[in-house]
Design a protein with these regions (language model features):
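Short amphipathic alpha-helix that is part of the acyltransferase structural core
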Residues: 1-31
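Short hydrophobic/aromatic beta-strand or adjacent loop that forms the aromatic wall/cage
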Residues: 43, 143-147
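Conserved beta-strand in the GNAT
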Residues: 47, 53-61, 69-74
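Active-site acidic-Proline motif in GNAT/NAT acetyltransferases
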Residues: 76-82, 112
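Conserved active-site alpha-helix within GNAT-family acetyltransferase domains
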Residues: 111-134
Length: 153
């Protein structure tokens, strides 16, 4: 497996589409998925490759002068629990530090709502994120938004 930073907007969108469309349990709302794909073109973007096959990606965005967010991340299901997400995160975290950010944040569905998101929550906690706040209706009442944060200092 190799992690590469992708700089070409079309390539970012191609990889994001390939991965997100293969993950309907997490990215099943077409409008939301298209927004992730569209916005990923202009953001710092890292992709994981198995040979020349893109198997995952992570995209950062700025949410404040001192804070970057893991805007969207996806790894093909057959590559889950193989260190792909951890490697993508390590590359993105390093870039966030280089860009001068003090904090990273990530949003996901609160633990206890859906098994696939419970695994996502455990992944972020294992990376060292801490619980910050839950917004019960930011997305909608069925998907309470859990925000996790991490200091980069």
């Amino acid at each position: 497996m190799e992690i590469r930073e992708i700089t070409t907007p079309d390539e970012k969108q191609r990889i994001a589409r390939l991965v997100l469309e293969a993950l309907p349990d997490w990215f099943g709302i077409p409008e939301a998925r298209e927004e992730y794909i569209e916005k990923s073109a202009a953001q710092p973007f890292f992709a994981a490759f198995d040979g020349e096959r893109a198997i995952g990606f992570l995209c950062l965005t700025e949410t404040g002068e001192d804070t970057a967010e893991l805007y969207v991340m996806g790894v093909l299901k057959e590559y889950h629990r193989r260190g792909v997400g951890k490697a993508l995160f390590a590359a993105a975290k390093q870039r966030a530090k280089e860009l001068g950010y003090s904090f990273l944040q990530v949003k996901t569905v609160q633990m206890g709502k859906y098994p696939e998101y419970d695994a996502t929550n455990r992944f972020y906690l294992a990376l060292g994120f801490g619980e910050f706040e839950v917004f019960p209706t930011l997305w909608d009442e069925w998907n309470p938004c859990q925000i996790y944060v991490m200091s980069l200092k």
